[in-house]
């Protein structure tokens, strides 16, 4: 099945800014998050949205995608080699020019692979940060042979077939004459070493797989999809090389009352008709507790109030966002006869047409409810 266009997945224009891409991603991530959306295809859609965001939010990846689409020539090549339709061309190219490139020392120190760990956070955990411990499976240097793969007291021998280079020169006859093609040595598997007496602990691999507990300090203000690099906590390196890094990717659960956009928090409070018409002082929940908010007389539904400094702290420690409180007027469903009579009286005073409800509208309302 062919992949959908990333711009189509996020519903953004090809000239969309990073901020627009981020906003679209947050909206869709909340919609398809498996913890919220229980539909069968929600998880697949969530992953599709995440994949599109990872590409379009990175300037270099976006540039490659804009040029090549899903047929990026950088994909499909690397440590594992090319595959599929490129295989035939690769073989021909190797035949005339020699595969494998220049000589590399197979025993040179090599950095270990990076690891990725996905951590799910509650909404407020992402806002305020937390210290936690995770456990990950990873390869570590064998403590018995110290990475050599050989039994203690012995050492690996240099491969006699490739002379320690890890590569063999293979001569081939072609229509253009005899050519030399360089291949990985199949005797030492490219390591340049032969281990006759293997370490019993790691079976000659030089590495063992263990579960490692790592302390993680989640920074306050971390957002959905962001990642934290933990240096040196990836897979073990080879031949004395440094370990890779661990990247912790965060998924933040939605909140039942608050919504987040960057460092700002949004919420909606229901108010009665008399509250917005006459004015009131209400208590509004914030991330740090309740605060009082004055509702001016005549407030319209949809009006938004800003609570400065009540949002999310900047993940880099540069200030804090605001909280936006939007008013929603709730229409009463079960009125008493007395309340209905008051509303009829008010309707008669106001005229019932919006164009007639001028500056004296709320004065009439006050009189109706106060019995003046």
From Swiss-Prot:
The keyword tRNA-binding does not apply. Zn(2+) 2 binds at residues 159, 162, 185, 188. Zn(2+) 1 binds at residues 142, 145, 199, 202. InterPro entries: DnaJ, DnaJ_C, DnaJ_domain, DnaJ_domain_CS, HSP40/DnaJ_pept-bd, HSP_DnaJ_Cys-rich_dom, HSP_DnaJ_Cys-rich_dom_sf, J_dom_sf. Its cofactor is Zn(2+). Its main location: cytoplasm. Keywords: Chaperone, Cytoplasm, DNA replication, Metal-binding, Repeat, Stress response, Zinc, Zinc-finger. Binds 2 Zn(2+) ions per monomer. It is found in: Cytoplasm. Residues 5-69 form the J domain. SMART domains: DnaJ. One of its GO terms (biological process) is response to heat. Homodimer. Participates actively in the response to hyperosmotic and heat shock by preventing the aggregation of stress-denatured proteins and by disaggregating proteins, also in an autonomous, DnaK-independent fashion. Unfolded proteins bind initially to DnaJ; upon interaction with the DnaJ-bound protein, DnaK hydrolyzes its bound ATP, resulting in the formation of a stable complex. GrpE releases ADP from DnaK; ATP binding to DnaK triggers the release of the substrate protein, thus completing the reaction cycle. Belongs to the DnaJ family. This is Chaperone protein DnaJ. It comes from Shouchella clausii (strain KSM-K16) (Alkalihalobacillus clausii).
């Amino acid at each position: 099945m062919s992949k959908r266009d990333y711009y189509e997945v996020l519903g953004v224009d090809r000239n969309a800014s990073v901020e627009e891409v981020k906003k679209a991603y947050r909206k869709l991530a909340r919609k398809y998050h498996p913890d919220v959306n229980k539909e069968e295809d929600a998880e697949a859609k969530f992953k599709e949205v995440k994949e599109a965001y990872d590409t379009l939010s990175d300037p270099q990846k976006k540039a490659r995608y804009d040029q090549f689409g899903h047929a990026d020539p950088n994909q499909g090549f690397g440590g594992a080699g090319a595959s599929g339709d490129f295989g035939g061309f690769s073989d021909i190219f190797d035949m005339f020019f020699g595969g494998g490139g220049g000589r590399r020392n197979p025993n040179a120190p090599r950095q270990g692979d990076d690891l990725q760990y996905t951590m799910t956070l509650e909404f407020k955990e992402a806002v305020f940060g937390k210290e936690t411990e995770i456990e990950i499976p990873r390869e570590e240097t064998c403590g018995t042979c110290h990475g050599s793969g050989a039994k203690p007291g012995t050492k690996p021998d240099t491969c006699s077939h490739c002379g320690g280079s890890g590569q063999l020169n293979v001569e081939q006859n072609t229509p253009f004459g005899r050519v030399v093609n360089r291949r990985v040595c199949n005797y030492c598997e490219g390591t340049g070493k032969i281990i006759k007496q293997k370490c019993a602990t790691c079976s000659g691999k030089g590495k063992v797989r263990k579960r490692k507990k790592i302390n993680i300090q989640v920074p306050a203000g971390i957002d959905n999809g962001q990642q934290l690099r933990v240096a040196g906590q990836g897979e073990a390196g080879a031949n004395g090389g440094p370990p890779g890094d661990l990247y912790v990717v965060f998924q933040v659960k939605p909140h039942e009352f608050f919504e987040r956009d960057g460092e700002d928090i949004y919420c909606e409070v229901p108010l009665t008709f008399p509250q917005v018409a006459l004015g009131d002082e209400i208590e509004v929940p914030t991330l740090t507790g309740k605060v009082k908010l004055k509702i001016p007389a005549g407030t319209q539904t949809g009006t938004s109030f800003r609570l400065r400094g009540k949002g999310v702290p900047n993940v880099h420690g540069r200030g804090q966002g605001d909280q936006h409180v939007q008013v929603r007027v709730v229409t009463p469903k079960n009125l008493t006869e007395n309340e209905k009579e008051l509303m009829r009286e008010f309707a008669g005073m106001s005229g019932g047409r919006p164009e007639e409800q001028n500056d004296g509208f709320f004065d009439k309302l006050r009189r109706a409810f106060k019995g003046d």
